[in-house]
Every structure is written in C-alpha cells, then in structure tokens.
Amino acid sequence: MKIIGVGCGPGMLTEQAIKELRRARMVFGSERAIGLARAYLPEGCQIKSIDDYKNLSRLHSDAVILSTGDPMLAGLGYLSGEVIPGISSLQLASARLHIPLSRVSVVVAHGRGHEKGMAETVDEVKRGKIVFLLADPKFNVMELYARLATLTPPIQVALCENLGYPEEKILVKTIQSPPEPSTALYSLFIGNF
C-alpha cells in the first residue's frame, strides 16, 4: 500500500507523487484528494471515494491512498505502507508568511480534541513558539482567542483560508482584533511573528 500526499491545493504534487500516481491501478481518497490527483491517474485505474476511514488498513497491498496535504501532518500517514510526502498547508503558509519552520509548533484540534488543542496552543505561545493550528469547522476559535487575549502581547493571528487554491486568503491581525474564519478549509498561525 502507498499513501500519497497530493498537496494542499492544485499544483502542489511532488514529482515522486506524480510518478507513483501514473502507475496506480487502484486509488482511494476523498473527493478533494481525487480531484487534485485525477489528471495523473492512468486510464483504467479504479478510483473510489472514501467515506469510511476506519477500514483503510484492510485495503489490498496494491492500493494507493490519497491524503490531502502531507500524510504526516494530521493525515493518513499512520497507515502501514510507503508514505510519499506532499506539500502541506503548513509549508505553504510558512512560505507565504516567511515564518521559519524551526519556530513552529503544530497543534491539531480535530474531533474531540478541541479542549486539548486550546490548552496546547496557549502553552506553546507562552513558550515563545509560533503555533500552526489545524482545527475542524466545529472548533470554537473565538474561545481560543479569548484565552490568548489574556497573554502578554504582541500576539498576532494569521488566518489562512483555502491555501493553494485561487480563492486563497491570508489575513494577519492582532489578538485584540483577531480574524474570523469564513470557510471550513482554514488554518491559523498564532504567536509573535
């Protein structure tokens, strides 16, 4: 089995990923991931949309599983098999904002991990790190902002929406007047940058 990162948007596939996609016979992925990879899939390749992620480990050894962004950044890299990295939203946002990756701490706040994600974000900002936060649409970003507002300034927040897509938007504000997400596909940089 191969787990291939298809990047966080159009044009973000690596040469290695393209090479592997061109040889694929059976591909599984979300609709978004399939859309990013479709142009490189050979004729006759079986393409299946994933709805149930619980049974992925049981797929045939020839299967290719597509992961948006990079499989090792809140992706499908936990599965057994060869991982082909992709260009992540973290890499793209860091490049756009000129934030060195060595200063970044990644916090994932998906599903039931909202409270833990908020606590980790506050702790990492206190330590002087710049947090890259990946959250799901149900994450209460306004509650996080209220917690961060009690810390000593300066704290900036960069809202990164639809990274890598034509409608990409990055908005940088202070914690006193933070940006509010307007789409489900967003991430945040938080800290002194």
Q: PLM features: what roles do these ranges have?
A:
Residues 89-127, 136:
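Short, glycine-/small-residue-rich phosphate/pyrophosphate-handling segment
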Residues 6-12, 45-58, 110-122, 171-179:
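A short, well-structured beta->alpha microelement
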Residues 9, 70, 88, 111-113, ...:
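Short acidic/polar capping segments at secondary-structure boundaries
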Residues 2-3, 15-16, 46, 62-63, ...:
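A contiguous loop/helix-start segment that scaffolds small-molecule binding in enzyme catalytic cores
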Residues 40, 76-77, 94-95, 117-120, ...:
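Short, well-ordered secondary-structure micro-motifs
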Residues 33-39, 114, 139-142, 167-168:
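Short, charged/polar "capping" segments at the starts of alpha-helices
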Residues 1-99, 185-186:
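Class I S-adenosyl-L-methionine
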Residues 72-74, 101-113, 175-187:
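A polyampholytic, Gly/Pro-enriched intrinsically disordered region
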